[in-house]
Amino acid sequence: MREIKFRVWDKNECKMKVVKEMNLKEANLINDLFPLMQYTNCYDINGKEIYEGDIVETTRAFNHIVGVVTMIKGCWYIQDGKDSYYRLIPRYGTCVNKVIGNVYENKSLLEEE
């Protein structure tokens, strides 16, 4: 069974927080003050949970990719800055995922060199 977890970015305190419960009556606050990010049910090479909004470094067919984890039509992808999408898949062979930050605390990691 898939584990369902969320975290939020607290814009007021500028820090990431784990969601322990949700009150859907106040759901409008989630998008405005607290952007909600879902757990992908995948771990990186260091055993860290991968969430939506994480910046991930990965390899595909020996290509180095840095991008943001996002959900598209029910599937998790890594979107690089060049409008390319790569499926987020558990580690196998030469495919290795590593969380290097997130879009709120480490946006500079997405800037092209």
Predicted feature locations:
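Secondary-structure transition motif
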Residues: 1-113
